[in-house]
């Protein structure tokens, strides 16, 4: 075994050659297995456990024979027989025939008696524990589990767990019968049964991919005397890849389904029913092989188990009914078909037929979908082989691309070809995402292109109309509110508009002029344009100036009362300046109220009359005794401080009239 392991590891080419031979020899195993499978099925049905133990042994032998290519038919014929179990143990070992005679003798009974009884029980107990339903249908399920459990478990589990396989290798090498019989069924079914789902999924796919050529694969084959299958596995990385796929996709999700479903299969008619489904599911070409191998080499499948358990699982994934197929040994046998030659063919076939699988499976969709799901589940980097299992290594490559590069571009392009069903789904979903975004982008360019034309050239004529509307008071209001902006607009338009509306523009500014006292700064702003215009059109200035003169006179008349007051105020101011010799601007520092308790008196000379409660405007603080004030009527005169009271409420209002000097009078007044 040690020699075989390195040999299998060393050359994948040898495995490939073995595969080719295997393919040629498969028809023979398929023919031979066809006959024995029936009795074996009967046995499996009746004595699922013993048969299982024997089948694993027999199956490995046919597969080994197929792999070895030298005695594929003889071994197939042997497989149906009971001696094949010894051959199985022997085959994995170095000298299949001699060891078959030697080991088979000792181990076969243990395997048959032990495996069916103990391993199957263990498996049943383990499986029943893990899968109570399996326990319910112990024997139908047991056979499946021994086949799938022992062979698949060992094969797949040893494959996933290289360490497990290595222990098996020593055991198998030393005691092929025992390890396959009890260690396989007892140890592996228990430990590795679910580990198969767990380990096979994560490890087996990857380890299988790498390990099929590696020793772990050999242990697997050793467990199920398949040195040649190992070469096949090494030579057929595709097989190993599919197996990982099966172990990952099928075993993890489907192994249990298988366990649950196999009950139905085993109890209902696991072997026959499962075989037909296998024939249906496995590619049609594999079907004959599956049919033959299923029964005679149901466990050769085990030897191929890396593929077989996974194919079984794969089938389970591909179809829930296939789970029944898995439940039936036929599944395992069909798997061997895939393993022995179908793997080679099936892998290529799976490129094409795998599509069949995937397509029927698409109907079941479980297979494809589970795989896409696995793809979605990056935890299944190993499942990448699953893609290979479906579509062969090329598909596996596509699977890697599709899984790892979940990116639609890579996976969608390569995978859809390999996977008509699963990849199409995944790719289809991805493409759906793509189109959604590009459409959004595509509309945008048109929008931008449309956006550029929207420049509004017709606006220039519009402003002319606006000016016509602004000619009335509205224009003046606009200028007052936005003098700077309006002024700029008018300045820009002056060359065109001035001939038509030069007077209006100046009139607008003239309207502002009356506010020179209150708002000198705006006046300056408004006058600036008029100055510029005057420079441009000096001849018009005289007429405009003439208009300005009457306008101030015209505006006051609008308010005759105000006009009279203004005139009185101006007259009083002139008299005040002459009388008090007051020079400079008249500024109101604050307002004060005459004390209501003060004595009233008439004014005379330079003094104002005192009226209780009257409010006076303080223009100057002449001395500590008197202040120069102005009454509401506009008369000026001195008022004694004693008669004045500060207006607390008016203090803030005073700020409006005179901010700078407001502070001084109060302290002085006080």
UniProtKB/Swiss-Prot annotation:
GO biological process: integrin-mediated signaling pathway; protein localization to plasma membrane; regulation of neutrophil degranulation; T cell receptor signaling pathway
GO-annotated molecular function: lipid binding; protein kinase binding
Keywords on record: Lipid-binding, Phosphoprotein, Repeat, SH3 domain
Disulfide bonds: none
Reported function: May be involved in myeloid differentiation. May be involved in integrin signaling in neutrophils. Binds to PtdIns(4)P.
Region listing for Disordered, in residue ranges: 1-561
One matching Pfam family: hSH3
Protein name: PML-RARA-regulated adapter molecule 1
Location of the region described as 4 X 12 AA repeats of K-P-P-[PQ]-P-[EQ]-[VAF]-T-D-L-P-K in the Swiss-Prot/TrEMBL record: 70-165
UniProt entry tagged with the keyword Phosphoprotein: yes
UniProt comment concerning the protein's domains: The SH3 domain binds to PtdIns(4)P.
Top-level division of the source organism's lineage: Eukaryota
Gene Ontology cellular component annotations, sorted alphabetically: plasma membrane; protein-containing complex
Organism: Homo sapiens (Human)
PTM annotation: May be phosphorylated on tyrosines.
């Amino acid at each position: 075994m040690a020699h075989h392991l390195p040999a299998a590891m060393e050359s994948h080419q040898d495995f490939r050659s073995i595969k080719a031979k295997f393919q040629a020899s498969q028809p023979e195993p398929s023919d031979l297995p066809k006959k024995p499978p029936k009795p074996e099925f009967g046995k499996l049905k009746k004595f699922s456990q013993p048969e299982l133990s024997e089948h694993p042994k027999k199956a490995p032998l046919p597969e080994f024979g197929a792999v070895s290519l030298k005695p594929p038919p003889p071994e197939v014929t042997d497989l149906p027989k009971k001696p094949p179990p010894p051959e199985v143990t022997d085959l994995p070992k170095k000298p299949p025939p001699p060891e078959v005679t030697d080991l088979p003798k000792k181990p076969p009974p243990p395997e048959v008696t032990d495996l069916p009884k103990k391993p199957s029980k263990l498996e049943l107990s383990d499986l029943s524990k893990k899968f109570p339903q399996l326990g319910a249908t112990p024997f139908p399920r047991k056979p499946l589990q021994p086949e799938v459990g022992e062979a698949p478990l060992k094969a797949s589990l040893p494959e996933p767990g290289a360490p497990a396989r290595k222990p098996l290798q020593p055991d198998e090498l030393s005691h092929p019968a025992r390890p396959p019989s009890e260690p396989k069924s007892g140890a592996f079914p228990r430990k590795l049964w679910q580990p198969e789902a767990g380990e096979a999924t994560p490890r087996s796919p990857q380890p299988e991919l790498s390990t099929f050529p590696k020793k772990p694969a050999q242990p697997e084959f050793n467990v199920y005397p398949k040195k040649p299958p190992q070469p096949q596995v090494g030579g057929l990385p595709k097989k190993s890849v599919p197996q990982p796929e099966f172990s990952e996709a099928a075993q993890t999700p489907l192994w249990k389904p298988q366990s649950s479903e196999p009950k139905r299969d085993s109890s209902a008619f696991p072997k026959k029913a499962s075989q037909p489904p296998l024939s249906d599911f496995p590619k049609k070409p594999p079907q004959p092989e599956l049919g033959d191998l299923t029964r005679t080499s149901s466990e050769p499948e085990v030897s191929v188990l890396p593929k077989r358990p996974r194919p079984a699982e794969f089938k389970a994934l591909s179809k829930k009914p296939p789970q029944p197929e898995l439940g039936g040994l036929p599944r395992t046998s069909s798997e061997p078909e895939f393993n022995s030659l179908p793997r080679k063919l099936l892998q290529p076939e799976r490129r094409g037929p795998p599509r069949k699988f995937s397509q029927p499976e698409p109907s079941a969709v479980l297979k494809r979908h589970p795989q896409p799901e696995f793809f979605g589940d990056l935890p299944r980097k190993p499942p990448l082989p699953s893609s290979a299992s479906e579509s062969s290594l090329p598909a596996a490559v596509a699977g890697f691309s599709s899984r790892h590069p979940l990116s639609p571009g890579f996976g969608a392009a390569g995978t859809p070809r390999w996977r008509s069903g699963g990849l199409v789904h995944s790719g289809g979903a991805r493409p759906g995402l793509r189109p959604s975004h590009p459409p959004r982008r595509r509309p945008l360019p048109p929008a931008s292109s449309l956006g550029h034309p929207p420049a509004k050239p017709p606006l220039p004529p519009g402003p002319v109309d606006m000016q016509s509307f602004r000619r009335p008071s509205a224009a003046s209001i606009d200028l007052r509110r936005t003098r700077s902006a309006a002024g700029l607009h008018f300045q820009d338009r002056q060359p065109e508009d001035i001939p038509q509306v030069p007077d209006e523009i100046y009139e607008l500014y003239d309207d502002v002029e009356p506010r020179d006292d209150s708002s000198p700064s705006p006046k300056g702003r408004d006058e600036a344009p008029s100055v510029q215009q005057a420079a441009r059109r000096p001849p018009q200035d005289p007429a405009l100036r003439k208009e300005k003169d009457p306008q101030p006179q015209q505006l006051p008349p609008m308010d005759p009362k105000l006009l009279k007051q203004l005139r009185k105020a101006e007259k009083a101011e002139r008299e005040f300046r002459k009388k008090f010799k007051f020079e400079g601007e008249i500024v109101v520092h604050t307002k004060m109220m005459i004390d209501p308790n003060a004595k009233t008196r008439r004014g005379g000379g330079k003094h104002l009359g005192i009226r209780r409660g009257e409010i006076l405007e303080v223009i100057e603080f002449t001395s500590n005794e008197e202040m120069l004030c102005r009454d509401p009527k506009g008369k000026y005169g001195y008022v004694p401080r004693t008669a004045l009271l500060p207006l607390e409420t008016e203090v803030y209002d005073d700020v409006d009239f005179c901010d700078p000097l407001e502070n001084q009078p109060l302290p002085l007044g006080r």
